[in-house]
Amino acid sequence: GNVQEVMDLSPVAHLAALEGKVPFINFFDGFRTSHEIQKIAVWDYEDLKDMCDMDAVAEFRRHALNPEHPHMRGSHENGDIFFQHREACNSYYTALPAVVEKYMDKINAKLGTDYKLFNYYGAADADRVIVAMGSICDVAEEVIDYLNAHGEKVGLVKVRLFRPFAAEKLIEAIPASVFAVYNELKKDEMKRQFTIGIVDDVTNL
């Protein structure tokens, strides 16, 4: 997203990580967004404090490595036991989208925004959409406005949470009128995988 969205959504990653007990990578377009000079509305720390669950912070600190109460991590396991432990954490990842939505809703209430796991922009009756994330979204919105003003019916789905991927929320965000993604729709034989804006003559995706 843009610089303002980075500011607004960074607390979501931290707060959801604390409550969900799952590590997050809070990422954005490194050069495009980090080197852009824009005026933004900066968060007040008191607003952040209101949203922060201090019990969750205390619980997080209790699990930190400490010589006063040592415990072992990263011990060796055979494949069968490791697989069971790996699957045991699935419930945390399954619950995580709801936790992220909870904090997005709190931010929406404070800022008057409308952040969701997937935000739709464009024609309500679009027949083609792009699904994208990052700084491309602002550019895509301008293109969508232009195309729709000239008789097209197109839209954009902005991805806010990439992993774990909430497929059912993506489906909810796409208008029912959509029947294909991007201009591949117009071809007799559509590609199932392709990179937007790049003619891939190396891997031919």
Each PLM stretch: what is its role?
Residues 24-120:
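Conformationally flexible catalytic loops at phosphate/diphosphate-handling active centers
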Residues 1-8, 88-99, 132-135, 162, ...:
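Catalytic cores of large soluble enzymes that bind and process phosphate-bearing ligands
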Residues 16-20, 34, 40, 121-124, ...:
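Solvent-exposed alpha-helices and their adjacent loops that cap or buttress functional pockets
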Residues 10-11, 35-42, 142-143, 192-195:
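Short acidic, glycine/serine/threonine-rich loops at helix termini
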Residues 1-30, 42, 54-55:
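Conserved thiamine diphosphate
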